[in-house]
A protein has these predicted regions:
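Gly/Thr-rich phosphate-binding beta-strand-loop-beta motif of the actin/hexokinase/Hsp70
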Residues: 51-77, 83
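Extended hydrophobic-aromatic, low-complexity segments
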Residues: 68-70, 81-85, 155-156, 181
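ATPase catalytic-site recognition across NTP-hydrolyzing enzymes
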Residues: 1-57
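Conserved acidic
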Residues: 1-4, 85-91
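Short, flexible loop/turn elements at secondary-structure junctions
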Residues: 19-24, 60-66, 75, 148-150, ...
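Interdomain helical connector at the RecA1-RecA2 junction of SF1/SF2 helicase-like NTPases
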Residues: 72, 78-89, 98-102
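Generic recognition of flexible, low-complexity loop/linker segments
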Residues: 41-48, 55-62, 129-135, 141-143, ...
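Mg2+-dependent endonuclease catalytic cores in nucleic-acid-processing enzymes, primarily RNase H-like
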Residues: 89-183
């Protein structure tokens, strides 16, 4: 019955009743790009992007002691013009304790290399800055888009890594970003 109702209904049924974790929840109000997300599933590393790209941009969303710090790197393949992406998240061990219901998911992300659990405040932003430094030193960095709310420590870490201030652009989240995401 669920299969006949469509992909979204089938995924929901399998998730709820067969204990199958589904990669994307394809709700009716989903982002339009979600329909194409899984078919683009080839894993790309940061090193792949550094070797193949002619330009790279970085997006950073700051976290805090009870939230994730996320970084996403997008590079354009110099031969195919295909966009390549790699992301990583950091979470402080305090957040793992506070969000016990998410702890096993955090561990899954750690196990596949997509997340780091940090013990000391500042280790996360130092690692972000190190990744950005590598991109900058490869002379591929165009700009860094960052939500300007509460990012002092990230900006300090980027400056300490030698990233020029003019490379950082504030991109507010919420309604200001919503229109661009829907295209």
């Amino acid at each position: 019955k669920a299969r006949e109702a469509g992909e979204e209904a089938f995924r929901g049924f399998m998730s709820k009743h067969a204990n199958v974790e589904i990669g994307l929840a394809l709700r009716s109000d989903r982002w339009a790009g979600a329909d194409f997300w899984e078919q683009q599933g080839r894993r790309v590393s940061l090193d792949d992007i550094l070797q193949r790209a002619d330009v790279v941009t970085v997006g950073i969303d700051g976290g805090g002691l009870d939230d994730l710090l996320g970084m996403y790197v997008i590079g354009r393949d110099r031969e195919t013009r295909e966009w390549l992406g790699w992301g990583h998240a950091w979470v402080h061990e305090t957040a793992v304790v506070r969000r016990k219901s998410e702890a096993s998911r955090f561990q899954d992300f750690v196990a596949c290399g997509d997340m780091t659990i940090v013990r000391r405040v500042g280790d996360d932003t130092a690692e972000v800055a190190e990744y950005v430094r590598r991109i900058h030193e490869a002379e591929l960095l165009d700009h860094i888009g960052i939500d300007p709310s509460g990012v002092g420590q990230i900006l300090d870490s980027l400056a300490e890594a030698g990233i020029p201030d003019e490379s950082v652009v504030g991109i507010s989240q919420g309604w200001k970003l919503g229109g661009a995401i829907k295209t």
